[in-house]
Amino acid sequence: MTKPTQVLVRSVSILFFITLLHLVVALNDVAGPAETAPVSLLPREAPWYDKIWEVKDWLLQRATDGNWGKSITWGSFVASDAGVVIFGINVCKNCVGERKDDISTDCGKQTLALLVSIFVAVTSGHHLIWGGNRPVSQSDPNGATVARRDISTVADGDIPLDFSALNDILNEHGISILPANASQYVKRSDTAEHTTSFVVTNNYTSLHTDLIHHGNGTYTTFTTPHIPAVAKRYVYPMCEHGIKASYCMALNDAMVSANGNLYGLAEKLFSEDEGQWETNYYKLYWSTGQWIMSMKFIEESIDNANNDFEGCDTGH
């Protein structure tokens, strides 16, 4: 490994670990008991992904395929103060407390609204401008009219992500970061059959978050507060189920508005096309009417985490 590559690996590894630490802090702030809550390992900065944005160009100039940076950004999407984990936990508590068992209630709508907003602002605004796209289908006669991101690995080359030293520090504060098995911090095959995942756990409360990304541009995050007494907990988004996002976009659009108001774009998107849970694409257009991208969200159980979407609604 050359010296510049070693420097890049160290730098990006630090950023990746910082993102994980921030996720841990967010979980502790929400769930930890006041008298035993682990100390904050990092200062709170909201939103955390702004820091990733500041170093994006530097990473792009030095990364071979950008997978390190994409993993960092995805981690910050989940960990940010405005992110899915904290909101999902609160929604779960409210839904369980009110015994709501219909995904069409405010519980489901609130979670979906947040997912749309944050996903547009972070994933679309950050991931989709990193590198080239590929066609949705090789059988597409045009070959490059729309594209779907292929982000299927958590590390470049054969560089392992070793969490042992980090865990030595975190364990002193009641925190664990564990892989699903011993090999899952190493780059996997670039196919949808292989996934990479890690689990962040608050040892005081047993609250943990599973962060998984699959091949073919799909991701899943699970927040799983343990509420065994509630029989219908599986109907609450982000409680014991996960949310998967699939998306495609116009080949040459970077999905960043002139004034950077991605949240405004997301809010407009959600208010104008409420769609149907699990079925409809959410479509985004420029003010000229030109299609930018389409997104699709689906709730899924942990036991059914490998399904994927076929094709793409191009908005026309």
Curated annotation (Swiss-Prot):
Disulfide bonds: 92-248, 95-312, 107-239
GO cellular component: a single term: host cell membrane
Membrane topology: Multi-pass membrane protein
Residues carrying a glycan: 181, 203, 216
A GO term, aspect molecular function: toxin activity
Key word Disulfide bond present: yes
Superkingdom, natural source: Viruses
Membrane spanning residue stretches: 72-92, 112-132
Keyword Cytoplasm: no
Protein keywords: Cleavage on pair of basic residues, Disulfide bond, Glycoprotein, Host membrane, Lectin, Membrane, Secreted, Signal, Toxin, Transmembrane, Transmembrane helix
Cleaved signal peptide residues: 1-26
Subcellular location: Secreted; Host membrane
Role played: Ionophoric toxin secreted by an infected host and lethal to non-infected sensitive strains. Cell killing is achieved in a receptor-mediated process, requiring initial toxin binding to a cell wall (1->6)-beta-D-glucan and, probably, subsequent transfer to a plasma membrane receptor. K1 toxin disrupts the cell by creating a pore across the target cell membrane.
Subunit (UniProt): The secreted toxin contains alpha and beta chains that are linked by three disulfide bonds.
Note from the entry: The killer phenotype requires the presence of two different dsRNA viruses: an L-A helper virus and the toxin-coding (M) killer virus. Killer strains of S.cerevisiae producing the toxin K1 kill sensitive cells but are resistant to their own toxin. The gamma and delta chains may play a role, on there own or as part of the protoxin, in the self-protection of the virus-infected killer yeast (toxin immunity).
Name under which the protein is recorded: M1-1 protoxin
Protein source organism: Saccharomyces cerevisiae killer virus M1
